[in-house]
Amino acid sequence: MTQTSTLANESAAGFVPYDVAEHLRTREEMAAYLDAWLEEAPDDVGGLARALGDIARAKGMTQVAKETGLSRESLYRALSAEGNPSFATVLKVTKALGLRLHACAAAVEG
């Protein structure tokens, strides 16, 4: 199902579409949102891409495109649920968003 048909179905059912990008106002909120995605689904590349896309839309995709040197179209494509952004793109986008990736030791499953 496409994003458009999903929104049309939600509207027809009386639901108001929720856009998380409208609620990410500070870098702290953006970082917490990204951390939550990484914590809940660390192997979900599409989810990570979509979360970065949500944050980029909150900041303004035109501004992110300008700061990364990438086109808006390529950012929308890469930062979607179907996207598979390169690591270089992820680093450029996180920098443009004022965020930083960091590593921590994972719990060892036994």
List where the protein language model places each region.
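DNA major-groove recognition helix of helix-turn-helix/homeodomain DNA-binding modules
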Residues: 86-104
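Structural motif corresponding to alpha-helix initiation and N-cap regions
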Residues: 17, 84-87
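Extended, folded domain segments that form the structural surfaces/walls around functional sites
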Residues: 33-35, 75-77, 85
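N-terminal flexible/basic segments that precede or flank functional cores
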Residues: 1-50, 54, 108
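Short alpha-helical DNA-recognition segment
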Residues: 57-77
